[in-house]
Amino acid sequence: RSSDLLLLLQRQSELTVTGIDIQPAAVALAERAAAENRLTDRLTFRCIDLRQVRQHFSTGSFDLVVCNPPYYPPASGKVSGDNARRTARSETEASLADICAAASYLLRWGGKFCLVHKPERLTDTACALREAGMEPKRLRFVQSRPDTAPSLFLIEGCRGGKPGVDIQPPLLLQTDTGAPTGELNVIYFRDQEV
Protein backbone atom coordinates (compact mmCIF):
# COMPACT_ATOMS: atom_id res chain seq x y z
CA ARG A 1 0.00 0.00 0.00
CA SER A 2 1.28 3.44 -0.83
CA SER A 3 0.23 4.72 2.62
CA ASP A 4 2.66 2.26 4.24
CA LEU A 5 5.41 3.40 1.86
CA LEU A 6 4.77 7.03 2.72
CA LEU A 7 5.17 6.31 6.42
CA LEU A 8 8.38 4.37 5.83
CA LEU A 9 9.87 7.02 3.54
CA GLN A 10 9.15 9.76 6.07
CA ARG A 11 11.11 7.78 8.68
CA GLN A 12 14.03 6.63 6.50
CA SER A 13 15.45 9.54 4.53
CA GLU A 14 18.00 7.42 2.59
CA LEU A 15 15.36 5.08 1.16
CA THR A 16 14.20 5.29 -2.47
CA VAL A 17 11.33 3.26 -3.88
CA THR A 18 10.16 2.41 -7.39
CA GLY A 19 6.64 1.02 -7.59
CA ILE A 20 5.27 -1.07 -10.44
CA ASP A 21 1.61 -1.69 -11.20
CA ILE A 22 -0.25 -2.73 -14.32
CA GLN A 23 -3.30 -0.61 -13.49
CA PRO A 24 -3.06 3.06 -14.56
CA ALA A 25 -5.58 4.21 -11.93
CA ALA A 26 -3.54 2.61 -9.12
CA VAL A 27 -0.35 4.25 -10.40
CA ALA A 28 -2.07 7.65 -10.69
CA LEU A 29 -3.38 7.38 -7.12
CA ALA A 30 0.05 6.42 -5.79
CA GLU A 31 1.74 9.25 -7.73
CA ARG A 32 -0.74 11.73 -6.31
CA ALA A 33 -0.03 10.52 -2.76
CA ALA A 34 3.73 10.84 -3.37
CA ALA A 35 3.28 14.39 -4.68
CA GLU A 36 1.01 15.43 -1.80
CA ASN A 37 3.64 14.20 0.65
CA ARG A 38 6.54 15.82 -1.27
CA LEU A 39 8.25 12.49 -1.87
CA THR A 40 8.40 12.36 -5.67
CA ASP A 41 12.20 12.54 -5.58
CA ARG A 42 12.34 9.24 -3.64
CA LEU A 43 9.06 7.52 -4.56
CA THR A 44 8.33 6.89 -8.23
CA PHE A 45 5.85 4.64 -10.00
CA ARG A 46 5.79 2.93 -13.37
CA CYS A 47 2.69 1.58 -15.09
CA ILE A 48 4.05 -1.59 -16.67
CA ASP A 49 3.27 -5.27 -16.94
CA LEU A 50 5.73 -6.99 -14.62
CA ARG A 51 6.08 -9.78 -17.17
CA GLN A 52 7.94 -7.19 -19.26
CA VAL A 53 10.34 -5.85 -16.61
CA ARG A 54 13.28 -6.82 -18.85
CA GLN A 55 12.23 -4.08 -21.27
CA HIS A 56 12.25 -1.43 -18.52
CA PHE A 57 15.01 -2.34 -16.04
CA SER A 58 18.47 -3.88 -16.07
CA THR A 59 18.91 -7.17 -14.26
CA GLY A 60 20.05 -6.78 -10.67
CA SER A 61 18.76 -3.19 -10.40
CA PHE A 62 17.33 -3.59 -6.90
CA ASP A 63 18.43 -4.78 -3.45
CA LEU A 64 14.89 -5.51 -2.30
CA VAL A 65 11.62 -6.31 -4.05
CA VAL A 66 8.37 -6.31 -2.05
CA CYS A 67 5.07 -7.63 -3.36
CA ASN A 68 1.48 -7.97 -2.22
CA PRO A 69 0.33 -10.15 -5.14
CA PRO A 70 -3.12 -11.26 -6.21
CA TYR A 71 -4.02 -14.08 -3.81
CA TYR A 72 -6.20 -16.28 -5.99
CA PRO A 73 -5.53 -18.34 -9.12
CA PRO A 74 -7.69 -17.40 -12.13
CA ALA A 75 -11.33 -18.52 -11.97
CA SER A 76 -11.18 -19.43 -8.28
CA GLY A 77 -13.11 -17.89 -5.44
CA LYS A 78 -15.59 -15.09 -5.87
CA VAL A 79 -15.00 -13.33 -9.19
CA SER A 80 -15.51 -9.57 -9.05
CA GLY A 81 -17.42 -7.80 -11.82
CA ASP A 82 -15.04 -4.85 -11.39
CA ASN A 83 -12.01 -5.32 -13.65
CA ALA A 84 -9.59 -3.42 -11.38
CA ARG A 85 -10.64 -5.41 -8.34
CA ARG A 86 -10.47 -8.69 -10.26
CA THR A 87 -6.93 -7.87 -11.43
CA ALA A 88 -5.87 -6.99 -7.88
CA ARG A 89 -7.35 -10.16 -6.36
CA SER A 90 -6.76 -12.92 -8.89
CA GLU A 91 -3.87 -13.90 -11.12
CA THR A 92 -5.54 -12.74 -14.34
CA GLU A 93 -2.60 -10.58 -15.49
CA ALA A 94 0.36 -12.41 -13.93
CA SER A 95 0.80 -15.74 -12.18
CA LEU A 96 2.73 -16.32 -8.97
CA ALA A 97 5.49 -17.83 -11.12
CA ASP A 98 5.54 -14.65 -13.28
CA ILE A 99 5.83 -12.49 -10.16
CA CYS A 100 8.72 -14.54 -8.74
CA ALA A 101 10.53 -14.57 -12.10
CA ALA A 102 10.24 -10.77 -12.36
CA ALA A 103 11.49 -10.31 -8.80
CA SER A 104 14.46 -12.58 -9.41
CA TYR A 105 15.39 -10.66 -12.56
CA LEU A 106 15.16 -7.31 -10.76
CA LEU A 107 17.24 -8.39 -7.74
CA ARG A 108 21.01 -8.27 -7.45
CA TRP A 109 22.68 -11.55 -6.43
CA GLY A 110 21.88 -11.99 -2.74
CA GLY A 111 18.98 -9.52 -2.96
CA LYS A 112 15.80 -10.13 -0.96
CA PHE A 113 12.24 -10.68 -2.15
CA CYS A 114 9.50 -10.18 0.45
CA LEU A 115 5.99 -11.38 -0.28
CA VAL A 116 2.72 -11.63 1.62
CA HIS A 117 0.25 -14.37 0.71
CA LYS A 118 -2.54 -16.64 1.93
CA PRO A 119 -1.51 -19.79 3.87
CA GLU A 120 -3.14 -22.09 1.32
CA ARG A 121 -0.64 -20.77 -1.27
CA LEU A 122 2.49 -21.51 0.79
CA THR A 123 3.58 -24.56 -1.23
CA ASP A 124 2.93 -22.74 -4.52
CA THR A 125 4.98 -19.79 -3.27
CA ALA A 126 7.96 -21.84 -2.10
CA CYS A 127 8.01 -23.76 -5.39
CA ALA A 128 7.75 -20.55 -7.46
CA LEU A 129 10.59 -18.96 -5.49
CA ARG A 130 12.90 -21.91 -6.08
CA GLU A 131 11.97 -22.16 -9.74
CA ALA A 132 12.93 -18.49 -10.13
CA GLY A 133 16.33 -19.00 -8.48
CA MET A 134 15.40 -17.71 -5.05
CA GLU A 135 15.59 -19.69 -1.83
CA PRO A 136 12.98 -19.19 0.91
CA LYS A 137 14.95 -17.87 3.90
CA ARG A 138 12.40 -16.56 6.43
CA LEU A 139 8.76 -17.46 6.99
CA ARG A 140 6.33 -15.88 9.40
CA PHE A 141 2.61 -16.47 9.74
CA VAL A 142 0.25 -13.58 10.54
CA GLN A 143 -2.57 -14.16 13.02
CA SER A 144 -5.26 -11.77 14.20
CA ARG A 145 -5.07 -13.10 17.76
CA PRO A 146 -3.15 -15.84 19.56
CA ASP A 147 -6.13 -18.23 19.38
CA THR A 148 -6.82 -17.83 15.63
CA ALA A 149 -5.43 -19.61 12.61
CA PRO A 150 -3.05 -17.64 10.39
CA SER A 151 -4.73 -15.50 7.74
CA LEU A 152 -1.52 -14.59 5.88
CA PHE A 153 2.16 -15.42 5.75
CA LEU A 154 5.21 -13.29 5.13
CA ILE A 155 8.06 -14.94 3.25
CA GLU A 156 11.50 -13.70 2.33
CA GLY A 157 13.40 -15.25 -0.55
CA CYS A 158 17.04 -14.65 -1.40
CA ARG A 159 18.28 -14.63 -4.99
CA GLY A 160 20.96 -17.29 -5.17
CA GLY A 161 20.50 -18.22 -1.50
CA LYS A 162 21.42 -21.58 -0.02
CA PRO A 163 18.70 -23.97 1.22
CA GLY A 164 17.39 -23.47 4.74
CA VAL A 165 14.45 -21.49 6.05
CA ASP A 166 14.02 -19.81 9.44
CA ILE A 167 10.46 -20.25 10.72
CA GLN A 168 9.77 -17.26 12.95
CA PRO A 169 7.17 -16.80 15.68
CA PRO A 170 3.80 -15.61 14.36
CA LEU A 171 3.09 -11.92 13.95
CA LEU A 172 0.10 -11.26 16.19
CA LEU A 173 -2.02 -8.26 15.27
CA GLN A 174 -4.22 -8.06 18.37
CA THR A 175 -3.99 -9.03 22.01
CA ASP A 176 -6.65 -11.15 23.70
CA THR A 177 -8.50 -7.91 24.48
CA GLY A 178 -8.51 -6.79 20.84
CA ALA A 179 -5.92 -4.03 21.27
CA PRO A 180 -3.06 -3.79 18.75
CA THR A 181 0.00 -5.71 19.90
CA GLY A 182 3.16 -3.90 20.92
CA GLU A 183 4.95 -5.35 17.90
CA LEU A 184 2.31 -4.00 15.52
CA ASN A 185 2.65 -0.57 17.13
CA VAL A 186 6.42 -0.70 16.55
CA ILE A 187 5.95 -1.76 12.91
CA TYR A 188 3.67 1.21 12.26
CA PHE A 189 5.83 3.60 14.32
CA ARG A 190 2.97 4.11 16.78
CA ASP A 191 5.48 3.80 19.62
CA GLN A 192 7.30 6.97 18.50
CA GLU A 193 6.39 10.60 18.19
CA VAL A 194 6.23 11.96 14.66
Per-region residue spans from a language model:
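Conserved Class I SAM-dependent methyltransferase catalytic core
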Residues: 92-150, 154
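Conserved SAM-binding strand-loop segment of SAM-dependent methyltransferases
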Residues: 38-51
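Conserved SAM/SAH-binding beta-strand->alpha-helix loop
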Residues: 23-25
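Short, small-residue-biased leader/transition segments that mark boundaries at the very start
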Residues: 1-2
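Mobile active-site "lid"/loop adjacent to the S-adenosyl-L-methionine
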Residues: 60, 69-98
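SAM/dcSAM-binding transferase cores
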Residues: 147-194
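Conserved SAM-binding motif I beta-strand of class I
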Residues: 16-21
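A short acidic, Gly/Pro-enriched loop at the edge of an enzyme's catalytic core
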Residues: 55-65
